[in-house]
Regions:
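Glycine-rich short-loop/terminal segments
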Residues: 7-48
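Short, compact, well-ordered microdomains
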Residues: 88-118
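Amphipathic alpha-helical packing elements
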Residues: 31-91
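Intrinsically disordered, low-complexity, mixed-charge
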Residues: 129-130
Length: 130
């Protein structure tokens, strides 16, 4: 299948997932909305409302140490800040604190205020939970 048709197919699938489940509509860079992780959606390209802006994979997951949770952490931070360097610097730590320990078989909401506070405290160089 030519690349153009693969891209159209991918965008159409993304549209269908978002139409069937509006909370999975991909956030744009700078949109600081709640992050939704859907265990009911088995296609790891569409199981969250976070778009794969940076990194080598579109597949995003949670509940273990690996590239799926790293890619999700990287793109959550990039979506919220628009700063690729910040996202790369802090993605492992974010993954460790928020994504590794949760059950991959369950869906989750990550409130935007929790993510925003974590980012602010990293920028200011403070500990999050004192």
């Amino acid at each position: 299948m030519p690349h153009f048709f693969k891209l159209v197919s991918f965008l159409y699938q993304q549209y269908l997932y978002a139409k069937q489940n509006p909370v999975l509509k991909k956030l744009k860079v700078g949109e600081q909305e709640d992050v939704y992780l859907s265990a009911a959606t088995h296609d790891t390209r569409f199981n969250t409302n976070i778009k794969g802006h940076i990194g080598n994979l579109n597949e995003m997951s949670w509940g273990f140490i690996g590239t799926g949770p790293y890619t999700l952490a990287l793109n959550i931070l990039y979506t919220f800040t628009g700063d690729a360097q910040f996202a790369r610097t802090h993605a492992f730590e974010f993954r460790s604190e928020f994504l590794e320990k949760i059950d991959s078989k369950k869906s989750y909401w990550m409130p935007n205020w929790m993510i925003s506070n974590w980012i602010i405290q990293k920028i200011e160089g403070e500990e999050i939970y004192e």
